[in-house]
């Protein structure tokens, strides 16, 4: 649903984007809540009830609907206000917890969310964002059809080079 929301945003259809944004959060939370039923001794004391979940999702959808399509950046490269893609990216990253590949490709594809944490030591010099990952040495040694990448900045064929201001 988050990918559909992204596609609808690209098409300028914010209504369908918001609907899929909401559906993505709803499904993600339902999946996490289902984990408690797998453990009979789980302490669900702090688990939110359906009303709390619905209210939280409604607040996020309201924030999404009132956000601008785009926003500017401050002197360090953070957004002056979160725009729709920042909000979508944040929730997509939360839903992808444990599935980093999709989140990594999302930021390479879109440059969002622009709210990612930077280096604490030098926030204005966090280095370049990795565009690829090196092949495992065993793969390079046994597969004569591939060459090891020279660095982490070599783009894959579909990488359009969108950069995140954080990097």
Question: Language-model features: where?
Answer:
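Acidic/polar-rich alpha-helix caps and helix-coil junctions
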Residues: 1-167
